[in-house]
């Protein structure tokens, strides 16, 4: 495991890493990554949005990551590439001072079952619990207070931040990142009603999480009732997201904060759900669907594209007037229909 040390790279090294065209001194060293406005003489910055072109001439950065068409006003060295934002993503990982920082080994306060299997170069933090039959892959970091339930598996090079709970019978793929407070494999919301009260339905399935998945803090993915809840490869899930039992999320999809997906709904690959989106149960969203924030989806979507529902914010007085008119729409429609029938009967 790496220790916390300052990051320093020459512009030549970064250009080679990013496959960028360097205009400037290849031996110039940079030690940080910052915005156009905040960057100092030892930093590299980036320009990925033309809105910020006006700030480029005044940046104090040593170098800027920029599209070839937008860097002519740069007062510093340039690393030119077609997708500066993607380049910024890679730079952010290079300059992350905490990347890989964790002491190798099992902390004395951790509880590890005899039948659990711990891979090589693993860090298990204070107060962790690794239950019977669990498998922790090579290079994993299990943060303080995290629990990996019986017969669950954490794939190689994954990281569980502090206080993550993985229930029994859960499979997490390689290179996953699970943030603090997320819960994988809790019981789904399953109950039968007899007319008087509720009777619990045991949730007998599991959860399968693919490779390269990131799950935000305080998000919940429930185990299947029968069969598994499945999260595909390279899925990105924001904080405070609720995914119910037997949901399936396709590869490369992204869910923003506070999304809620009811049971047995299937979301295709390359889908994007904005913040606060709600999906009713037993629906299917095809590949390539984008749903804008706070929308409610109550029917399946079979064509890729952008979908929205709801009403955007407006001054309260106008909203109240429109709300009153909305309540009158049914009666207005009936009156219009009667008028149209009367007009058609007129010679």
Curated annotation (Swiss-Prot):
GO molecular function, one term: N-acyltransferase activity
Active-site residues, Swiss-Prot/TrEMBL: 245 (proton acceptor)
Catalytic activity: a UDP-3-O-[(3R)-3-hydroxyacyl]-alpha-D-glucosamine + a (3R)-hydroxyacyl-[ACP] = a UDP-2-N,3-O-bis[(3R)-3-hydroxyacyl]-alpha-D-glucosamine + holo-[ACP] + H(+)
Swiss-Prot/TrEMBL keywords: Acyltransferase, Lipid A biosynthesis, Lipid biosynthesis, Lipid metabolism, Repeat, Transferase
PROSITE patterns: HEXAPEP_TRANSFERASES (PS00101)
HAMAP family, alphabetized: LpxD
Function: Catalyzes the N-acylation of UDP-3-O-acylglucosamine using 3-hydroxyacyl-ACP as the acyl donor. Is involved in the biosynthesis of lipid A, a phosphorylated glycolipid that anchors the lipopolysaccharide to the outer membrane of the cell.
Protein name from the UniProt record: UDP-3-O-acylglucosamine N-acyltransferase
Organism expressing this protein natively: Chromohalobacter salexigens (strain ATCC BAA-138 / DSM 3043 / CIP 106854 / NCIMB 13768 / 1H11)
Gene symbol of the encoding locus: lpxD
């Amino acid at each position: 495991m790496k220790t916390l040390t300052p990051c320093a790279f020459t512009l030549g090294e970064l250009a080679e890493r990013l496959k960028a065209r360097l205009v400037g001194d290849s031996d110039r060293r940079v030690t940080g990554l910052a915005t156009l406005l905040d960057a100092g003489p030892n930093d590299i910055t980036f320009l990925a949005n033309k809105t910020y072109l006006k700030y480029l001439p005044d940046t104090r950065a040593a170098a800027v990551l920029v599209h070839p068409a937008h860097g002519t006003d740069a007062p510093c060295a340039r690393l030119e590439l077609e997708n500066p934002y993607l380049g910024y993503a890679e730079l952010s990982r290079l300059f992350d001072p905490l990347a890989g920082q964790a002491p190798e080994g099992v902390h004395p306060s951790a509880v590890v079952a005899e039948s659990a299997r711990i891979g090589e170069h693993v860090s298990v933090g204070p107060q962790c619990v690794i239950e019977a039959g669990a498998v922790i892959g090579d290079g994993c970091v299990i943060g303080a207070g995290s629990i990996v339930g019986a017969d669950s598996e954490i794939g190689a090079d994954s990281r569980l931040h502090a206080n993550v709970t993985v229930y029994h019978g859960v499979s997490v793929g390689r290179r996953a990142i699970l943030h603090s407070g997320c819960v994988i494999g809790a019981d789904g919301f399953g109950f039968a009603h007899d007319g008087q009260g509720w009777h619990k339905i045991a949730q007998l399935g599991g959860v399968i999480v693919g490779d390269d998945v990131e799950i935000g803090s305080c998000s919940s993915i429930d185990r299947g009732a029968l069969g598994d809840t499945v999260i595909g490869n390279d899925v990105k899930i924001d904080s405070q997201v609720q995914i119910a039992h037997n949901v399936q999320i396709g590869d490369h999809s992204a869910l923003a904060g506070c999304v809620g997906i009811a049971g047995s709904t299937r979301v295709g690959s390359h889908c994007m759900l904005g913040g606060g989106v709600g999906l009713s149960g037993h629906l299917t969203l095809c590949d390539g669907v984008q749903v804008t924030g706070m929308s409610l989806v109550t029917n399946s979507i079979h064509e890729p594209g952008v979908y929205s529902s709801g009403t955007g914010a407006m001054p309260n007085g106008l909203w109240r007037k429109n709300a009153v008119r909305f309540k009158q729409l049914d009666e207005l429609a009936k009156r219009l229909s009667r008028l149209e029938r009367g007009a058609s009967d007129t010679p």
